[in-house]
Amino acid sequence: MKCGVFMEVYTQELPLRTSRRVELIDITSMVSGVLESSGIRNGILNVFSRHSTSAIFINENESRLLSDIESMLEGTVPVDASYGHNAIDNNADSHLRAVLLGGSQTVPVINGSMDLGTWQSIFFAELDGPRNRRIRVSVAGKP
């Protein structure tokens, strides 16, 4: 697809309240709502977590898989290990888990829809909750 020089950019912040220390929340419909509001039909969409103890990832929304992801995080970065950062704040595991998952995801926008695969959903990973969080969604492209 050919894109001209001039693009529109639309951005919106989404508030989110989490309820558990580790929580994986499907935000696909929230993000889709921002895309619809943007009026952009072709381009890219970025979802960014504005926090260093949370993450954004794309995967299948299946309850056993989500449980496996939580187990993988605990096995890879145990909450009770000895971390230097815990001398300041007792949440080093949350920061390290966020590094592994990443703080943003970018999705192509084609004909007004996110070009996600059949089983793909966008997730917000709370890694140090419960908290009030903010997610930034930016869409760039042509209407």
Swiss-Prot record:
Pfam families registered for this protein in UniProt: UPF0047
Family per record: Belongs to the UPF0047 family.
Source organism superkingdom: Archaea
Alphabetical list of InterPro entries matching this protein: UPF0047_YjbQ-like (IPR001602), YjbQ-like_sf (IPR035917)
Matching Gene3D superfamilies: YjbQ-like
Name of the featured protein: UPF0047 protein MTH_771
